[in-house]
Amino acid sequence: MKNMLRYVVPAIWALLATLCGQTAAAAIDAKISFETEIPKAFVCGENSTAELSGLHYKDGSRSLRWSWSAPSTLRFNDFGQLMRSLRVKGAGVMLWIYNPRAVDADMRFSFETPTGEVPYRFDFHMDFTGWRACWIKYNDMPGDHASQQVSRLTISTPAGVESGELFLDRLTFSEVKLHDQITPDKQIP
């Protein structure tokens, strides 16, 4: 029995370490890359442009730089990816945002249906400079959550801010449950 435990216990620990490592990696691996091109699912609204940038990045050597004159939007139109994420209980959106100029205003993230309804949304406070992480579950977002037929994410420029830019990186619409620890901060109260 003692000899058997000597082999079984390390095997169990190795299995658990492998499983935990895979879950953690799946939760944080960026699904959308800005290394070689801007994915076709991104569409800039009027008064804005998007380009790849090596100026500020979190993963690899590039991020998505979005510059705008208000009002404007940046849309992500990948119905399939959004639906796969929304079907997972406890899933959500994860990204990093670099803000070069702090403003006392909120950027709105709206998950919209094909008819323009907004069952999920959140505001991200922009009174910071540098990088900030944004991890939020769909079920923690305000909204009526009545529809699961989300077809796009629309990011809207902050009200009262004439122009600006920000950098996005490590954008992921998780397809696994995010951890349950709620960590509100100044960006997402």
What are these regions (language model features)?
Residues 27, 45, 57-59, 86-90, ...:
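Short, surface-exposed loop/turn motifs at beta-strand boundaries within globular domains
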Residues 68-144, 161-167, 172-177:
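Extracellular ligand-binding interfaces
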Residues 1-8:
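N-terminal secretory signal peptides that target proteins for export/translocation
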Residues 9-21:
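Bacterial N-terminal signal peptides
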Residues 143-154:
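Noncatalytic modules at the cell exterior or secretory-pathway interfaces
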Residues 25-47, 177-189:
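Extracellular carbohydrate-recognition regions
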